[in-house]
Design a protein with these regions (language model features):
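Regulatory and interdomain segments flanking nucleotide-handling catalytic cores
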Residues: 1-218
Length: 218
């Protein structure tokens, strides 16, 4: 079973020119990361601040959703370091509106940049139908497990609402299975600092949700 992500950046038009440049760079970086890290997965930026991702194995989906949210929320750190002002508070709190779908892709061709099929139609349609204060939607063709999948994704979405930009950086690395020592070295903080960030985020709940989801049968 495959999956797709359709997303757009919340209130990106509130960003100054310098902020938009940073945002575009971070989106391109994420697409490169996705292509290199997850076999058969790829993504593209559409309509300036829109995102479409084709996921070759639905088991990757929850981890990729978390990584994408972290990538966007961590932008605040770059803004502070570069002294970039402006931006709507909803951009910094939520970062990205996202609709995901678990289903079939008739065509998933990274080389030709073609994704086509029911899954991308479903996620794209769901994103277009979202209201101003809706930030997440999920649909699944695997009806037997849909209630469990919905619960796991909604739990993760709720947790991510209160994760700070700096915590998002830590979580992004932890989701790549880096050790606390390695994260501490990259962040320039102590191992205890990493531990406290992860505890505040709710890493135990996130890692349990990931294990549960990645063991599901699709």
């Amino acid at each position: 079973m495959e999956a797709t992500i359709s997303a757009d950046i919340i209130r990106s038009t509130s960003l100054p020119k310098e902020g938009m440049i940073v945002l575009q760079e971070r989106l391109r970086d994420f697409m490169d990361f996705l292509n290199k890290t997850f076999d058969g997965c790829w993504g593209r930026v559409v309509r300036g601040d829109g995102i479409e991702c084709a996921i070759s194995d639905a088991h990757y989906l929850l981890r990729i959703v978390l990584l994408l949210k972290c990538q966007i929320k961590a932008i605040r750190v770059c803004f502070d370091e570069m002294n970039i002002k402006g931006g709507d508070k909803r951009f910094f709190k939520f970062g990205v509106r996202m609709a995901v779908a678990i289903g079939r892709l008739r065509t998933n061709d990274k080389e030709q940049a073609i994704m086509d099929g029911e899954a991308i139609y479903n996620s794209g349609r769901a994103l277009d139908q979202m209201g101003s204060y809706d930030f997440f939607s999920i649909s699944s063709d695997y009806k037997e497990s849909e209630p469990i999948v919905q619960s796991l994704f909604l739990l993760i979405n709720h947790i991510m609402k209160r994760v700070s930009a700096r915590q998002s950086q830590v979580l992004f690395m932890k989701l790549q299975n880096m050790s606390d020592v390695e994260i501490a070295q990259r962040m320039g903080i102590t191992r205890v600092g990493v531990y406290l960030h992860l505890k505040s985020i709710g890493w135990d709940a996130i890692s349990t949700a990931l294990r549960c989801y990645e063991m599901m049968k699709f």
